[in-house]
């Protein structure tokens, strides 16, 4: 496979940095990915030469900034194959996107006697907003359970979803287990039998695989910019146009109105601007547009193929470490969760950092998964398009040193 890993790595300045006098080995990409030079440079150019408010001014800077923002909306629509640019809403990130749906669609269409279905492998961002809604609306939440393999027990769907289910919320890829759910198959199964809306948390999928929202046939899809080599504080909510049109605004302010009158009431803007109150994160939008350009230039299918090969390499290496527990046999994306027996994940992470190795430890904002596996925390490595075999080799070498050191205290 002709994958330009050297050229790609040279595009990411942070990979040349040293941490604690050791070369940085960055394996925390599921938490946040790094930015290529083109994204960093584009943000600087915008902030230093192009900055202005959008949708407000008649002057050149404002008109250009508005055009750039709307062009990027169109670019994102094409990237995930949305039918219309108006189906793309800019939000702060995945968390805000899910909260927007819960607080607009959920508040409008979910009533007492209905139920919400989510899965046991969700990030807290796809659990807590629905719990809050369920408390307000007095409705039940049901859960699709996990299997020890790290897969969802899809056979239970028919027992859990019923005619009172209004929305099914599911992660595309588990942020801990690395499991890629068969979204298209699951949605088809559900929609063949029920009139149910489906929301997908795509935070861990967007940078690793081709997303086609029309083919998937989801009603909502959310992701964050910093997961796909872009800036923090910017994300995208995709929603089917016919649903967005029926949803009331969530936040009020400038940009989301057509007319404000003190006595006869306010009329709201068309979608998607109805959901974008106030001044947007224009710099973040500009950076996200450039990061998507970069991913398209490399090729998302090429990236997926490369990462799949790399994670297999990592899995083979890590399995050879004695007294290690890997928490999923269904690793098919970019993530490996593990613990060293007799060692706390916090200690492992702190000591790896001494060797310049960055991993994630803790409950990963997914406590229900921790409870399922009867642990308080896990270690997690996660790769990206710029990760390579030397990253894995250095990680393994450092992990063995950490294990040897911690063994002295057991």
UniProtKB/Swiss-Prot annotation:
SUPFAM superfamilies: PLP-dependent transferases (SSF53383). The keyword RNA-binding does not apply. GO terms for biological process: cysteine metabolic process. The keyword Phosphoprotein does not apply. Keywords: Cytoplasm, Lyase, Pyridoxal phosphate, Transferase. GO terms for cellular component: cytoplasm. It catalyses: (sulfur carrier)-H + L-cysteine = (sulfur carrier)-SH + L-alanine; L-selenocysteine + AH2 = hydrogenselenide + L-alanine + A + H(+). It is found in: Cytoplasm. The active site is at 365 (cysteine persulfide intermediate). Pathway: Cofactor biosynthesis; iron-sulfur cluster biosynthesis. It comes from the Bacteria. Its EC number is 2.8.1.7, 4.4.1.16. One of its GO terms (molecular function) is selenocysteine lyase activity. Its cofactor is pyridoxal 5'-phosphate. The modification N6-(pyridoxal phosphate)lysine is found at residue 227. Belongs to the class-V pyridoxal-phosphate-dependent aminotransferase family. Csd subfamily. Cysteine desulfurases mobilize the sulfur from L-cysteine to yield L-alanine, an essential step in sulfur metabolism for biosynthesis of a variety of sulfur-containing biomolecules. Component of the suf operon, which is activated and required under specific conditions such as oxidative stress and iron limitation. Acts as a potent selenocysteine lyase in vitro, that mobilizes selenium from L-selenocysteine. Selenocysteine lyase activity is however unsure in vivo. PANTHER family: CYSTEINE DESULFURASE. Homodimer. Interacts with SufE and the SufBCD complex composed of SufB, SufC and SufD. The interaction with SufE is required to mediate the direct transfer of the sulfur atom from the S-sulfanylcysteine. This is Cysteine desulfurase.
């Amino acid at each position: 496979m002709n994958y330009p890993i050297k050229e790609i790595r040279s595009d990411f300045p942070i990979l040349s940095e040293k941490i604690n006098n050791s070369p940085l080995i960055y394996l925390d990409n599921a938490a946040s990915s790094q930015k290529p030079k083109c994204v960093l440079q584009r943000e600087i150019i915008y902030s230093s030469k192009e900055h202005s408010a959008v949708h407000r001014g008649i002057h050149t800077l404002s008109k250009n900034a508005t055009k750039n923002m709307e062009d990027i909306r169109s670019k994102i629509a094409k990237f995930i194959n949305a039918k219309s640019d108006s189906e793309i809403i800019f939000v702060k990130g995945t968390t805000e996107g899910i909260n927007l749906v819960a607080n607009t669609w959920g508040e409008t269409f979910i009533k007492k006697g209905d139920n919400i279905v989510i899965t046991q492998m969700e990030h807290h961002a796809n659990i807590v907003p629905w719990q809050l809604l369920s408390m307000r609306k007095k409705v039940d939440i049901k859960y699709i359970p996990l299997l020890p393999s790290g897969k969802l027990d899809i056979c239970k769907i028919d027992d859990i979803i019923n005619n009172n289910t209004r929305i099914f919320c599911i992660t595309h890829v588990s942020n801990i287990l690395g499991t890629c759910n068969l979204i298209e198959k699951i949605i088809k199964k559900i929609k063949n039998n029920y009139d149910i809306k489906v929301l997908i948390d795509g935070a861990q999928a967007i940078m690793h695989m081709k997303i086609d929202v029309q083919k998937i046939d989801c009603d909502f899809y959310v992701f964050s910019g910093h997961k796909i080599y872009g800036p923090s504080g910017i994300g995208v909510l995709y929603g089917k146009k016919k649903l967005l049109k029926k949803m009331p605004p969530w936040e009020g302010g400038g940009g989301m109105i057509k007319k404000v009158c003190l006595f006869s009431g306010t009329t709201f803007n068309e979608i998607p601007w109805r959901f974008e109150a106030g001044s947007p994160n224009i710099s973040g939008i500009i950076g996200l547009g450039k990061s998507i350009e970069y991913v398209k230039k490399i090729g998302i299918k090429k990236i997926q193929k490369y990462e799949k090969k790399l994670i297999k390499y990592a899995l083979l290496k890590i399995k050879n470490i004695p007294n290690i527990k890997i928490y999923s046999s269904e690793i098919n994306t970019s993530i490996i969760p593990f613990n060293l027996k007799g060692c706390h994940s916090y200690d492992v992470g702190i000591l790896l950092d001494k060797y310049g190795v960055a991993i994630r430890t803790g409950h990963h904002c997914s406590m229900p998964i921790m409870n399922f596996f009867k642990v308080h925390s896990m270690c997690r490595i996660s790769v990206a398009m710029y990760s390579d075999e030397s990253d894995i080799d250095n990680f393994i070498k450092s992990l063995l040193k950490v294990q040897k050191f911690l063994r002295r205290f057991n």
